[in-house]
Design a protein with these regions (language model features):
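Conserved acidic donor-binding segment of nucleotide-sugar-dependent glycosyltransferases
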Residues: 294-305, 312-316
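Nucleotide-activated donor-binding/catalytic signature segment of Leloir-type glycosyltransferases, i.e.
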Residues: 222-241
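Short hydrophobic beta-strand element within catalytic cores of glycosyltransferases
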Residues: 255, 275, 279-282
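A charged, aromatic-enriched C-terminal amphipathic alpha-helix characteristic of glycosyltransferases
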Residues: 305, 315-345
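Conserved donor-binding/catalytic core segment of Leloir-type glycosyltransferases
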Residues: 4-6, 178-194, 200-207
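Glycosyltransferase donor-sugar binding loop
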Residues: 40-43, 187, 209-222
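Donor nucleotide-sugar binding/catalytic pocket of nucleotide-sugar-dependent glycosyltransferases
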Residues: 127-166
């Protein structure tokens, strides 16, 4: 199949959720299909076959339109950095016109709220298919008249795996982390909405050590950084090429965000930690409960529960979290996407789980 994949502002490093998902889908689709990977306000990437094209904010561009028309796509995927907004729907309509009516899907990885004006325009501009990663978001968009489906989450299960005891010890020595400590980790944006202040209490517990890795491509909360460092947390606020090493040196992973826009709806860091067979303590965030039931080392934390008690239980119980994601690879997600792109609207109900 000839598929156009478009997402704005793509440039390495792909250490932010939407960019990361778009880049992985480009690569996975290109392994089996003929793919034209495009971005605007980004940078060419030969490894992905990604081409940066000049355009305005509404994607009105003779160059972009010409590239897509000459490619003669059979399907198109648009992963907007703004997710499902009225203007993103309008841009999807522009892309569809460039593709001469090729079936067009818009991928939204975060929920959005709409005014009455926005809802009215979205009903008029809806693309052929909207892919979401939570039942709630899919349902909200279906109520606006969109054909929706769930795109299964994915992780690189070859890159992210269980660490050996030797690897763990060596990495702790390299990063200056106490070898005998119970190490709990968080990877993602250094922002207050991630609820990272909760980690200060854990750092104060005897025998515990907290590691936080902040995204280098997003704005960081300076006061939060100072508080974490002041408490003795190991804080890494630069890009880490081998992010898997941070999971390998850890004993558990924590994701404590509660605000719905704090991350993409199925946070990649949670999937990566599961693939590394770490116990994971997470809020029931976004689409996580839609795809993963609690158990096997995955614990859902609610604010009324004492965090340190739940973390202690997670660290002391058997763990088999890798089994939760072993089949959820990027090639599998790409294959599911191609199936959804070829499905009639009547076949989409409940699709993607």
């Amino acid at each position: 199949m000839r598929i156009v994949v478009f997402s704005e502002r793509l440039r390495a490093p792909y250490d932010e959720g939407i960019k990361n998902v778009a880049a992985h889908l480009m690569a996975a689709l290109a392994a089996e299909h003929e793919v034209l990977a495009l971005t605007s306000q980004g940078v060419d990437d030969a490894r992905l076959g990604l081409r940066n094209v000049d355009s305005n904010r509404m994607l009105l561009s003779p160059q972009l339109g010409g590239l897509i028309r000459r490619f003669q796509p059979q399907a198109m995927l648009y992963a907007p950095t703004a997710c499902a907004t009225p203007f993103a729907f309008a841009r999807a309509r522009v892309l569809r016109r460039y593709g001469r009516g090729a079936r067009t899907a818009l991928l939204t990885l975060q929920p959005r709220r709409y005014t009455a004006w926005g809802r009215a325009w979205m009903r008029r501009l809806a693309p052929d298919l909207v892919l979401a990663q939570s039942r709630r978001t899919a349902g909200a968009l279906a109520a606006l008249g969109c054909h929706t489906a769930l795109l299964p989450p994915a992780v690189d299960t070859q890159r992210f795996r269980a660490a050996t005891s030797e690897e763990k010890a060596g990495l702790r020595a390299r990063y200056g982390i106490p070898g005998a400590a119970q190490v709990v980790t968080h990877v993602g944006h250094l922002k207050g909405k991630r609820n990272l202040a909760q980690l200060l209490e854990l750092q104060a517990q005897p025998g515990y050590h907290v590691v936080v890795v902040g995204s280098s491509s997003t704005e960081q909360d300076t006061a939060l950084k100072e508080a974490l460092r002041g408490a003795g947390v190991t804080l890494i606020d630069a890009y880490v090429e081998r992010i898997e090493d941070v999971y390998y040196l850890s004993d558990a992973y924590l994701f404590l965000a509660e605000e719905e826009t704090a991350a993409i709806e199925v946070p990649l860091s949670v999937l990566e930690a599961l693939a590394c067979n770490l116990p994971v303590v997470s809020t029931p965030f976004g689409g996580l409960p839609d795809f993963f039931a609690e158990g096997s080392g995955l614990y859902y934390w609610h604010a009324q529960t004492e965090l340190k008690t739940l973390v202690r239980a997670a660290l002391s119980a058997p763990c088999a979290t890798r089994g939760l994601v072993e089949a959820r690879t990027w090639p599998a997600a790409a294959a599911a996407l191609v199936t959804l792109l070829g499905s009639a609207p009547s076949e989409l109900r409940g699709a993607g789980l």
